[in-house]
Structures are given as structure tokens and as C-alpha cells.
């Protein structure tokens, strides 16, 4: 029993917390593999009341394009003094470009498209436009131009008008939409419209569920139980949040509406432990771990907790069920049936159990990618207990790659809908915070700074 209790502490963050608490266009521009298109994103200006919201607009646009990981953004310090607001601002291309000492373009550099393609900017693409106000709406007219085209008349990739309620939220909304349309031209998916749900600790001994946008904006507290609320999971349609809470004493599953903020009905069988909820891809059922019969086992139930059915039948601790989002027919989970926590998979009936990780250290926190072909997970891989790093495994070949290296504790990976980004928690900056990175381990970005934050999951 002593051995199992010690293992439980390191099985997963969920159990550790419990023990501690007890204590437009169809044309896609193709970029060759390994290359990144260079894009210039000069600050757009607004007229009238729109101008006061342009800082939020420009920062949001920059963050969305930068975080996509498919562009190299030109530093704004290299941009020309004059930025076109609309296509009509471009000057006719001269027959031959002037040399560096020419006065052909006095005080007008930037109004020739070739200015943006040549040094020091050297951009492949230029995004520009302007905003104004109409009937209490902020209006953006935005364009994307191919700066390598000879002449502005042939350079337009797309131009579009965007509308949103006047205000900072509206400015962010049209920036997200403009960025999404830019990314769409290159076959990339914008993360705008998604949310990161996580466990935030702002007061000692109290953990609540919070949300934040993928660009680090609009951080918001969602639960107020003044207790421990952990292991969040978002429903596929973005209407429900499931999590484990100590609010009523014993840890149980709570389900909360993301539309109203109200708690929804969910029946919990009497059990010392009920945790790690996960919605099925169709959003009709919830999987979770419960110790109602002794050791924690995996169960599945309806959204209100009815129809509870046991899935695993081991004399071990089985937790953290994650359903393949593509097939909906297999579950990845963690178990100590081989001695230390490892990742396994099985079908929805609990049969055809296969071990995926090697046993060289503790492997926890499995997370399927949207295509259902890879699993991100946390692994000590020979290090001392607790020193986790994030890995990604190809499920078919069992080959894996390490994404984080020698930078503290890195755990709880979760995939973004685009399959290109991973959100995770790390204490590399001192305390546990929420970070994002590309799925190759590059372009790391810290999203949270206050308190301690962990167990992130992506949802709508």
C-alpha cells in the first residue's frame, strides 16, 4: 500500500493536487517546406473614435500572425515613414527604381510597392488598411498585397471589409478576423475563437478555473467556489465545462455552463475520488476516473452523470481518459499496472489494451492531436520524479520526439485545433505558468504571469 500511495503522488497533477489538498479565397498560397514567408504588418490608423482602439487592434493582429508560426514578421522599426491606407495610395511604379541618393521619392517612401519588397524591409507580403466608425460600429477595410509583384495593380491577394461593435473588444474582433483571412490564404487556421481553460491559484489553498485567449488577452475567472477546482475539460461545442471540485468535501465532477456560468446537474456516486473528466467527441457523454469500487478506474456516463458504466477492470490506478477526437473509438489513459504510471490505449469498451510508453520514467497527461495520429504527453524519461518534459508520440510507429529541454517542469500539454500549437504549463520562469509553443517545440510564449497556473486545455 505504501508503494501505491507514493506512486499516486506522482501519477498525475490531478492526483497530486488531491493529496496536497487533503493536505475567403479558395486559392491557397503554398510555401516550400522549411521556408517562411516574410510579412510586413505596419500599424494601421483609425479615424475619429476608432483611433483610441488601434493599439489593441494592432497588437492583436501582430500576435495572431506571429503566433501562427508560418511567417517571419519584419520588425516595425524597419518600416517606411509612410504606410498606404488603401490601394489608391500606391504610386505608379517607375520604369527603373531610383538609387539610394535619389530625391525621386522625397517624404513618400513606402508608397511604392517595391519599397516594401526591397531592403531594409524585404517583405514578401504587406498587410495594410484603415479603420473608421459608422453607426457605432468600428469598420476595417483591410488588404493583403504580394509585395513581390511588379506593380500594385496586380498585387492584391484579397481585400475585405470588417464590422464590429465600437470598442476595444470590437477592435480585437476585427483584428482576429483580418488575421484569420490572412492565414487562410496560406492554408493555416487561426486560433481566434478558441479559449484556453486552466487551473489558477491566486490565493493560497484555493484553485479556480480560469480562461484566457491564445494570445494571452482576456484572462477571466470562471469558478468561485473558494476551494479546489482542478482538471478542466471543455465540451466540443464550447457550451460546457467539466472539472473536479472539492467544494462539497469529497472531490467530485462539476459541470458548468459556459454560456450562463451556472452549474449544471451531474450525479456523482459516493466515492473518495472522482476526477479527470473528458467529453466524448460528440459531446454526449463524459469519461472520468472514480474510486467508487476501490482503486481509481475509468467510467463513462451521460452528461448528467446518469447511465454510469465502468470501462476498465484492473487492480491498478487508471486515470486521465482521453478519447481520440478523430475516430471517437479509442481512449488513451494512464495506469500503474506495469509498476509506474504509463500511457495505454484501449477501445471504448475497455478491450484491446495496449501500452504505448516504454517505462523509462513516469509518463502522464496524454493528449491526442486533432488528427488522432499523435499523442502529446509529459514524461520524466529517466529523470528524478517530478521533472517532466513534453514529448509527442506517433501512435502508429511509437516513435517520439522531445519538445522541451532542461527548463524546469513542463507538463499538461494540450493541442490547438490547428494541430500546429501546443499549450502546456511550465515553471521555467520561476512559478508554474501557462505557455504555448509550436508542435516542433519552437516559438515558446508565456501567457500568464500572476499566481500559479497549470492544467491548460484548449476549447471553444
Tell me what each language-model feature is.
Residues 22-37, 135, 148-223:
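C-terminal/domain-edge helix-coil "capping" segments
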Residues 190, 200-208, 224-227, 244-253, ...:
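A flexible loop/linker signature enriched in serine peptidases of the S9 family
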Residues 196, 241, 283-287, 331, ...:
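Hydrophobic beta-strand positions that form the internal "hydrophobic ladder"
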Residues 190-192, 236-237, 281-282, 325-327, ...:
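Residue-level detector of Asp-centered blade-edge/turn motifs that repeat once per structural unit
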Residues 89-181:
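Amphipathic beta-strand/beta-sheet edge segments enriched in Tyr/Trp
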Amino acid at each position: 500500500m505504501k508503494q501505491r500511495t507514493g506512486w499516486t503522488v506522482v501519477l498525475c497533477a490531478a492526483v497530486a493536487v488531491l493529496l496536497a489538498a487533503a493536505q475567403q479565397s479558395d486559392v491557397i498560397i503554398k510555401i516550400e517546406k522549411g521556408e517562411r514567408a516574410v510579412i510586413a504588418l505596419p500599424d494601421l490608423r483609425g479615424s475619429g473614435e476608432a483611433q483610441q482602439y488601434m493599439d489593441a487592434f494592432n497588437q492583436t493582429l501582430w500576435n495572431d500572425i506571429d503566433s501562427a508560426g508560418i511567417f517571419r514578421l519584419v520588425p516595425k522599426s524597419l518600416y517606411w515613414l509612410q504606410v498606404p491606407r488603401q490601394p489608391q495610395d500606391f504610386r505608379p511604379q517607375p520604369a527603373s527604381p531610383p538609387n539610394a541618393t535619389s530625391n525621386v521619392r522625397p517624404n513618400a517612401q513606402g508608397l511604392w510597392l517595391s519599397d516594401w519588397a526591397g531592403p531594409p524591409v524585404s517583405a514578401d507580403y504587406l498587410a495594410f488598411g484603415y479603420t473608421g466608425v459608422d453607426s457605432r460600429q468600428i469598420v476595417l477595410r483591410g488588404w493583403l498585397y504580394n509585395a513581390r509583384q511588379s506593380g500594385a495593380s496586380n498585387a492584391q491577394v484579397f481585400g475585405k471589409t470588417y464590422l464590429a461593435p465600437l470598442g476595444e473588444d470590437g477592435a480585437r474582433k476585427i483584428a482576429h478576423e483580418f488575421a484569420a483571412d490572412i492565414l487562410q490564404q496560406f492554408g493555416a487556421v487561426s486560433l481566434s475563437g478558441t479559449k484556453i481553460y486552466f487551473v489558477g491559484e491566486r490565493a493560497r489553498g484555493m484553485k479556480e478555473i480560469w480562461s484566457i485567449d491564445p494570445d494571452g488577452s482576456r484572462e477571466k475567472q470562471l469558478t468561485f467556489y473558494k476551494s479546489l477546482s482542478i482538471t478542466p475539460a471543455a465540451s466540443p461545442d464550447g457550451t460546457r465545462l467539466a472539472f473536479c471540485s472539492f467544494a462539497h468535501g469529497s472531490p467530485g465532477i462539476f459541470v458548468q455552463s459556459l454560456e450562463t456560468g451556472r452549474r449544471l446537474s451531474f450525479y456523482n456516486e459516493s466515492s473518495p475520488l472522482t476526477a479527470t473528466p473528458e467529453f466524448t467527441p460528440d459531446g454526449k457523454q463524459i469519461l472520468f476516473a472514480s474510486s467508487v469500487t476501490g482503486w481509481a478506474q475509468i467510467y463513462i456516463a451521460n452528461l448528467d452523470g446518469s447511465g454510469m458504466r465502468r470501462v476498465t477492470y484492473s487492480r491498478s490506478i487508471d486515470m486521465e481518459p482521453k478519447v481520440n477526437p478523430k475516430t471517437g473509438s479509442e481512449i488513451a489513459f494512464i495506469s500503474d499496472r506495469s509498476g509506474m504510471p504509463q500511457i495505454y490505449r484501449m477501445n471504448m469498451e475497455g478491450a484491446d489494451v495496449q501500452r504505448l510508453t516504454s517505462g523509462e520514467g513516469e509518463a502522464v497527461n496524454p493528449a491526442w492531436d486533432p488528427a488522432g495520429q499523435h499523442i502529446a504527453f509529459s514524461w520524466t524519461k529517466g529523470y528524478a520524479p517530478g521533472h517532466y518534459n513534453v514529448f509527442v508520440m506517433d501512435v502508429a510507429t511509437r516513435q517520439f520526439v522531445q519538445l522541451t529541454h532542461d527548463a524546469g517542469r513542463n507538463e499538461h500539454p494540450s493541442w490547438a485545433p490547428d494541430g500546429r500549437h501546443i499549450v502546456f504549463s511550465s515553471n521555467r520562469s520561476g512559478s508554474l505558468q501557462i505557455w504555448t509553443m509550436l508542435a516542433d517545440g519552437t516559438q515558446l510564449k508565456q501567457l500568464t504571469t500572476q499566481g500559479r497556473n497549470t492544467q491548460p486545455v484548449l476549447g471553444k
